[in-house]
Amino acid sequence: MRKLAISVLASLSAVLAGCQDPYSEIKSMAGQTLSEGTVVEGVVISDYASMNMGENPQVSWNEVDIMMSYKTAYIQSENGKAGIRVIFDDIYENRMPRSSKVAIDLAGCSVSVDENGACTVTGIRADDVTVLKDRVAVKPASKRISELKDSDLYTYVTITGVEFINKEGSYTNVNEYVVQASALNDFRKPKNLECIDVAGVYVRDGKGEKIFLPVNTSSYWRRRGDRLPDGVGKVTGILVPADFQRYGNVGKYALRLISNREVDIPMDGSSNYETVAEWNWDRNYKHALNLEDRGLLKWVSGVATPAGRIVPEIGSGALYTTAEATFDLVPDYNTRSVHDGHRPGIGSRKAGALEIDSRTSEWFEGDAAVVVEASTKGFRGKALVLDFTWAAGKGRVDSSFGFPAYWAVEYSLNGVDYTTAADDILLRPIAYEKSPMSYYAAPGYLENSIVLPKSLLGKKKVYLRIRPASDVMVETHEDPSKDINSGVYSPEKSRDFALVIGKLSVKALR
């Protein structure tokens, strides 16, 4: 057996314990197979019973290796200043008790370090681990989002003063048919495709900073019918690098929750953000579009409505497109339970999102945009914020490509002269249920939050628009792992395009 007695460990540990920073010493061995006598001590901050400890890799378009999360664990130094990720050879090898102090013999293991300095050790077995102490008090470091740094990666962190950006739905607002089967949704027939795993939500603070909370869809707590908290509080978890290709640029860091018990946010309470205007079809019980010049138009499935100026549900203003387009209402996936909505087991809400149907030439060749007009008169604060959820396509492979990949958000006080606030917003195709689906297709609508200048507050009217930022086009590939943001538009490539907006809000950051 490779399990070592504590007395032996004491001598072996001298190799690293004598170092001023043993975790940095391990990082310096990146690319090597570690030699005999390399032992590291630390406190276990992960839980082997959790289904949310690591990202499960895509094996093929319709298969995910869900065992990776079970093989993943994290230890940090007793002072919480440094941490490493350890990956066991098998799921049954990972039995390190949470909050225990352990010593791990790293002989024969491999070390890798990513561009952010996050360190991973692979090749560990149960016999390599000795528990030195059963229970150790683990106090997470308390930080604001702006205070996070690379040295915090793979440590236990509490992020304070945050609230959910999108407080409707669940931790995973997804089409349940395309994600992992679990006790939540494994009653469906035909069986789930199980071709996508990780989903998640954002929290943000009173400065407009945000961080992604990735949630593996095997996690039972993710969508049990509970509503998300409304207030401002704190979340605790393991800080990890943010690399989630389906969701584009989600920031540098993400916070992995062990479970939703680590969310300490009041269910009710005030927000740092005040709604100026909101377009949201979730409570659209009449299944109608409210157009400025035509009033409520009853939605009929499969019948397009000529585009117009849509009246907001909250506040005053208009939402419209300058493209030659028609409107439709399509499902939204922001329900609290998989049983909610019009298709039990899917978790979708009938007529809960706006679909803008047009040709891609309208967006690539002209100056087409989604435009928002709103009055900010009477609103004060630190900034104006534009929040929206969106995706592209109709849930079919033939509508999952050919559209602009990168988009910009711009603002104006006169509707003519616009200033760019962001130009790297990614638009992903919504997951489709057949064909070799791209690894970049999203299981639900992506969340976006763009902070705009304070000078836009207190105005009779402001103009915000969302438009293509370049001629980079989403392509489809035989290899589903290949980057879809690789095409370049030309007129002969014009095709039908469905842009879907689940919700759009203009808010004042107080």
Q: Positions of the model-derived regions?
A:
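Terminal, low-complexity interaction segments
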Residues: 281, 393, 401, 407, ...
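Surface-exposed, low-complexity/disordered Ser/Thr/Gly/Pro/Asn-rich loops and linkers
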Residues: 309-380
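Extended extracellular/luminal ectodomain segments enriched in beta-structured repeat modules
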Residues: 365-367, 376-394, 459
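OB-fold nucleic-acid-binding modules
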Residues: 19-69, 76-270
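Conserved Ser/Thr-centered positions that define the repeating blades of beta-propeller domains
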Residues: 409-412
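Extended, low-complexity, turn-rich repeat/linker tracts enriched in Gly/Pro/Ser/Thr and Asp/Glu
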Residues: 52, 166-171, 378-380, 390-403
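Bacterial Sec-dependent N-terminal signal peptides
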Residues: 1-28
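Extracellular carbohydrate-recognition regions
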Residues: 267-327
